[in-house]
């Protein structure tokens, strides 16, 4: 019994750095996503999604597929800017997936501009060694 407890602790210690690395890697991807969005590059944003990805926008219809996702973001880029996303937590999902919880802040392009905030949950999957968004859902804080 004691041996099992020691093994469990050792495996837990080994997993902690891997999760920290995953969180840092996912945050880097979120930074790339926000940079592309803030530049108005809908094609670059859409390229971060898997071909069969789903986006479930708050208060809008669900979209599926990279082309539909690009159209959605192109529309939203006209109204929003200054996007900053923060990864709060990452959980592994098998060998090639990760679940992420985070928050985003943004500014509207209306006059006068208004600040906004939202929370999101996404599922990432590895395709050809690269992380791609598979499911993206969010809702507004207010």
Predicted regions and their residues:
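Bacterial N-terminal signal peptides that target proteins for export
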Residues: 1-8
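Repetitive helical segments and hydrophobic/amphipathic motifs
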Residues: 11-12
